[in-house]
Amino acid sequence: MSKTLYQKIYDSHIVYEDKNSESILYIDLHLLHEVTSPQAFDALRNKQRKVRQSRKTFATMDHNVSTTIQNISASGSMAQKQMEQLIKNCQEFNIPLYDINNPNQGIVHVIAPEKGMTLPGMTIVCGDSHTSTHGAFGALAFGIGTSEVEHVLATQTLKQKRFKNMKIEIIGEIPKFVTAKDIILFIIGKLGSSSGTGYVIEFCGDVIKNMSMEERMTICNMAIEMGAKSGLIAPDEITYKYLKNKIYSPSGLSWEKSLDHWKFLKSDKNAYFDKCVTVDISNLAPQITWGTNPDQVISIDEKIPDYNNINSAIKRESSKSACEYMGLQSNTYLTNISIDRVFIGSCTNARIEDLRSASKILKNKKIAKHVKAIVVPGSKLVKRQAEQEGLDRIFIDAGFEWRLPGCSMCLGMNKDRLHFGGRCASXSNRNFEGRQGRGGRT
């Protein structure tokens, strides 16, 4: 029987199958951070349980960390408490931790791939919605809640129902100045922020085949913004080249055996998909969100849509509400709107390739005097590499602040926040109300 990539990974990880309900899947890699794990560890202690597979569990500090000072006390008392608790939990349960003093610390969805922890065919979970990032390697990766974090820590398994299969084929030649972020924003805008609900989405097509791993990670990172459980891209030679000689990647004979297995990880020719979509990006322009939902997106040269012309009452009201919150008017250009902040970073766009692209545009230019702009590398490895290439000097000369790694302005959970009513042009993945700070407009 022909199978999709998702079905192959799901079926190969079944520990107990219940065809009428949820099956139990084995989890290959469990990623942790300081925010969603404390309660799970407390529950383990209360039930006198141990971590089942500490070698398949990995932790880092990213959500709360300061990007200006390498000190856990720099982000406030609550953040400090969470980070101290993570240190204690990892020591007690023998879990490897990249804390802020570790030379490899960074955003969890950046460091796991760059270290070779993320491998094709794996099941990967984390208490973070953008775990779908790892699907770029042909891994079934998704976010879980705190009670599920506890369950995986205790059993290395998780109950999961089967999701439907969606295929999105991306075709055409990528126009100049268009990036992977533009492509996925366009798809979200075209299909809607709930279009992926109930599905695991496999992205394919010539455009995907020609993308780097960094670009593929951006695509899968934002599959969750369509409501999908996860995003997947079949591994290929680009994947193998990226993974070879990484610290946690297989080596020697194990590498050859892994390659043989990974080459099997693709959807069969006649595999059935519940939904198929083809997207042509040949005439695509750079995209930008104008509202408070990722599907409220337009081309940079388009006007904000007139909500009075929207047929759906729900979408019409949503657009009207977004305009009011954002302080915008229909039929106006975003290029005429003044901004207060610029943020380059997050698990969507903080890898070395992203920083190279941004630096090319900024070279020999200066930002407006009233704008505060920051660059937050996704990891210390990315930071070191960028500094070796002189990218930090380009950003600094342009007027940006060059920061330490962390989630930073992607979410208002640390000191990097947008002031009330402030506007930020952000490379992150969400533009929800208050996402970057109370009253902030992304």
From Swiss-Prot:
<dbReference type="InterPro" id="IPR018136">
    <property type="entry name" value="Aconitase_4Fe-4S_BS"/>
</dbReference>
<keyword id="KW-0028">Amino-acid biosynthesis</keyword>
<dbReference type="GO" id="GO:0003861">
    <property type="term" value="F:3-isopropylmalate dehydratase activity"/>
</dbReference>
<dbReference type="Pfam" id="PF00330">
    <property type="entry name" value="Aconitase"/>
</dbReference>
<comment type="function">
    <text>Catalyzes the isomerization between 2-isopropylmalate and 3-isopropylmalate, via the formation of 2-isopropylmaleate.</text>
</comment>
<feature type="binding site">
    <location>
        <position position="407"/>
    </location>
    <ligand>
        <name>[4Fe-4S] cluster</name>
    </ligand>
</feature>
<feature type="binding site">
    <location>
        <position position="410"/>
    </location>
    <ligand>
        <name>[4Fe-4S] cluster</name>
    </ligand>
</feature>
<dbReference type="InterPro" id="IPR001030">
    <property type="entry name" value="Acoase/IPM_deHydtase_lsu_aba"/>
</dbReference>
<keyword id="KW-0408">Iron</keyword>
<dbReference type="InterPro" id="IPR004430">
    <property type="entry name" value="3-IsopropMal_deHydase_lsu"/>
</dbReference>
<dbReference type="GO" id="GO:0009098">
    <property type="term" value="P:L-leucine biosynthetic process"/>
</dbReference>
<comment type="similarity">
    <text>Belongs to the aconitase/IPM isomerase family. LeuC type 1 subfamily.</text>
</comment>
<keyword id="KW-0411">Iron-sulfur</keyword>
<keyword id="KW-0479">Metal-binding</keyword>
<keyword id="KW-0614">Plasmid</keyword>
<dbReference type="InterPro" id="IPR036008">
    <property type="entry name" value="Aconitase_4Fe-4S_dom"/>
</dbReference>
<dbReference type="InterPro" id="IPR050067">
    <property type="entry name" value="IPM_dehydratase_rel_enz"/>
</dbReference>
<keyword id="KW-0432">Leucine biosynthesis</keyword>
<keyword id="KW-0004">4Fe-4S</keyword>
<dbReference type="GO" id="GO:0051539">
    <property type="term" value="F:4 iron, 4 sulfur cluster binding"/>
</dbReference>
<keyword id="KW-0100">Branched-chain amino acid biosynthesis</keyword>
<comment type="pathway">
    <text>Amino-acid biosynthesis; L-leucine biosynthesis; L-leucine from 3-methyl-2-oxobutanoate: step 2/4.</text>
</comment>
<dbReference type="GO" id="GO:0046872">
    <property type="term" value="F:metal ion binding"/>
</dbReference>
<protein>
    <recommendedName>
        <fullName>3-isopropylmalate dehydratase large subunit</fullName>
        <ecNumber>4.2.1.33</ecNumber>
    </recommendedName>
</protein>
<feature type="binding site">
    <location>
        <position position="347"/>
    </location>
    <ligand>
        <name>[4Fe-4S] cluster</name>
    </ligand>
</feature>
<dbReference type="InterPro" id="IPR033941">
    <property type="entry name" value="IPMI_cat"/>
</dbReference>
<keyword id="KW-0456">Lyase</keyword>
<dbReference type="InterPro" id="IPR015931">
    <property type="entry name" value="Acnase/IPM_dHydase_lsu_aba_1/3"/>
</dbReference>
<comment type="subunit">
    <text>Heterodimer of LeuC and LeuD.</text>
</comment>
